[in-house]
Amino acid sequence: MSIFVTGDIHASYDIAKLSESCFDTAGLTKDDYVIICGDFGLVWNNSASEQYWLRWLDTRPFTTLFVDGNHEGFSLLDSLPETTWNGGAVHQVATSVFHLKRGQLFNIDGYQIFTMGGASSSEYDRTHRTQGKTWFTEEIPNEQERAAALETLDAADWDCDFVITHCAPSSNAQGISEHTDRLKIHPMDEYTDWLQTIQDRLTYRHWFCGHYHIDAQIQDKTTALYNRIAVLADPKTIADTDDEETLSLPYQLLPEPAGTQKSPIPDYVSQIDDQDSLEIDLD
């Protein structure tokens, strides 16, 4: 069993990193997991395109997990069946595709993984999108969700192995700015300040986020992902080692694919009228 973590896929726009040409899945099964750090983007309106890509993920030899970002269809997402999976609440999106709800702690392959989705859309998005259709106030966790997250962490004595969010806590601003100017679009805000209170108090091995469209370690124990895929160290290795390097960086980045990552869209799907049922501004 292996656990992989990667960044935003934005529906089909950036899903190519999970294709066979970019991601060697030899030997993987549905007992292996790929966690997407938000902006999953395949739950908006049940379009033919969305249904195709969800079926495509179901055919891949891994189980797909994701936290929500700010580019999600929250009306549909929140209406999906909720169940308990590996100790936490999830929405089941497809046979082997699960939304890891906010403020949950999952036991996956012996690792305790805390999830807290959500992020603020850019001013451009809030101005040019339609609230309740292509932009949702639910993108920011509400007070009840935050209270539930604190209760989850209280029950775990504020100790876990990994944290998965979409945006980063505010103290990561400098590290992000060294790699991108996207903070001009997505500045730190009240929610990232709240995440900072979590990071300051929590004992954890490593924190992963998406949102900023970079692949970089932005703080000693925080990594932002976009195109690259990280594989978590085997928990038995972590438990048995006293190697400081392994303990300080408990994951490895898979080799970067050569060439352009192009979405593996077959001809008949590319002809579907609503293939691009939502214009996503990646700038």
Residue ranges with predicted function:
Residues H10-A11, G41-L42, H71-G73, G118-S122, ...:
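Short, solvent-exposed loop/turn segments at secondary-structure junctions
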Residues T246-D283:
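A short C-terminal boundary segment appended to hydrolase-like catalytic domains
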Residues T6, S12-N107, K184, M188, ...:
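Core catalytic region of metal-dependent phosphoesterases/phosphodiesterases
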Residues T63-V67, T83-G87, H91, T95, ...:
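Conserved beta-sheet core of the metallophosphoesterase superfamily
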Residues I15-A16, N45-A48, L76-S79, C167, ...:
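A short acidic (Asp/Glu
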Residues M1-F4, Q104-T115, F162, Q219-T223:
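Beta-strand-turn-beta hairpins that frame and shape the catalytic cleft
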Residues T95, D109-P187:
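Active-site-proximal loop/helix segment associated with metal-binding centers of metalloenzymes
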